[in-house]
Amino acid sequence: MEDRRLVHGAAPPLTAVERFLYGQKNDALCSKKQESSRDQPIVKTKISIETRSDNKENTTFGPTREKHLVLNGGNRNPTGEVVARSAARDYQNSTKKRSSKNLIKGQWTAEEDRKLIRLVRQHGERKWAMISEKLEGRAGKQCRERWHNHLRPDIKKDGWSEEEERVLVESHMRIGNKWAEIAKLIPGRTENSIKNHWNATKRRQNSKRKHKRESNADNNDRDASPSAKRPCILQDYIKSIERNNINKDNDEKKNENTISVISTPNLDQIYSDGDSASSILGGPYDEELDYFQNIFANHPISLENLGLSQTSDEVTQSSSSGFMIKNPNPNLHDSVGIHHQEATITAPANTPHLASDIYLSYLLNGTTSSYSDTHFPSSSSSTSSTTVEHGGHNEFLEPQANSTSERREMDLIEMLSGSIQGSNICFPLV
């Protein structure tokens, strides 16, 4: 009994040496297991993304996956077996759908149309994916559009009648270029056919063949039957639309022009009485020039007329616009004022020249032969511009002798500059 207890009883505790040896054995076993797991074959299958361009529709057939098939030597793993089956199935599906990459994007042939009609009768008008699988080279969208726009049995392919064009015009006035909505209102006409008819009518108006067709139509009006004539309801409607657009553009341009005219008014609007700016500004000045001309034409001013001699102490110049005297004697001013009051004014003779032009030429160039007798004194009787000052104070106003009895005239600028420099007193005649 004791031996059995020793055999079946609890093991005695291990010593330090036994624990060390036991750890070494465990490490060896772990390393062997790792080596055996490395030697096992690993099968990897990669399935790439399959993308199929189906008439502007991209369909992705599943993500990329990596599946590891682990076979433990001769023993087959059931999980690995399932993964292998799914990988094989995916590979078969990918090979099937890879063949549908090469789609035909050209026109449909008569054979394809007949096959599509037969498939639609078998599967109906909704299962386009199934129909496209049996129709090689065509996508589901291509089959659907071909059927609804061309192969449907209720589609009208003859010319448009006046009633159809009237419905088209009325619907276009209400909803605009919504061809799908208009197609619901016109039985037998698809969205594509309505749009094509609209564009063809518009292009026919703008083409150069229009005049030839009109001339031929005028010649053949008597022979042509009413059914052969093309309805012109849509054509007239398109013309009215274009005419309205042109009128709108013209109105906008007119509004822009009126705004620009209002922002920049003319002088004729300012002077509404018919007087121009030159006549308004030139009226008073012409009268003043006539006044000066009459004075100097009838009463030329000189030192002798003023009762002054050249031997006086301070004598200043006389010009055609007034007197400048630097003399403290008040009697001199009185004599000048009296002489100015006693001067008589006579109206000048009517001449084709302006008084301002004659007066300026008289100031700058002296008197001419044609006007010396009527308006201004002759060169022999014209006065001289003299300035007598003590010690020659003002060189600008020095007298200039002339051997030919012509005396230099002084213009307004020289007269004013002399009056400012000499601090002279100016007595205007006006």
Curated annotation (Swiss-Prot):
Disruption phenotype: No visible phenotype under normal growth conditions, but in the double mutant plants myb64 and myb119 the female gametophytes fail to cellularize, resulting in enlarged coenocytes with supernumerary nuclei. Residues 214-224 have a biased composition (Basic and acidic residues). It comes from Arabidopsis thaliana. Residues 100-155, 156-206 form the HTH myb-type domain. Its main location: nucleus. Expressed in ovary septum and stamen filament. The gene is MYB119. One of its GO terms (molecular function) is DNA binding. Keywords: DNA-binding, Nucleus, Repeat, Transcription, Transcription regulation. Residues 128-151, 179-202 bind DNA. It is found in: Nucleus. Transcription factor required for female gametophyte fertility. Acts redundantly with MYB64 to initiate the FG5 transition during female gametophyte development. The FG5 transition represents the switch between free nuclear divisions and cellularization-differentiation in female gametophyte, and occurs during developmental stage FG5. CDD domains: SANT. This is Transcription factor MYB119. Residues 53-79, 193-229, 374-405 are annotated as: Disordered. GO terms for cellular component: nucleus. Residues 200-213 have a biased composition (Basic residues). Pfam families: Myb_DNA-bind_6. Residues 374-387 have a biased composition (Low complexity). Gene3D superfamilies: Homeodomain-like.
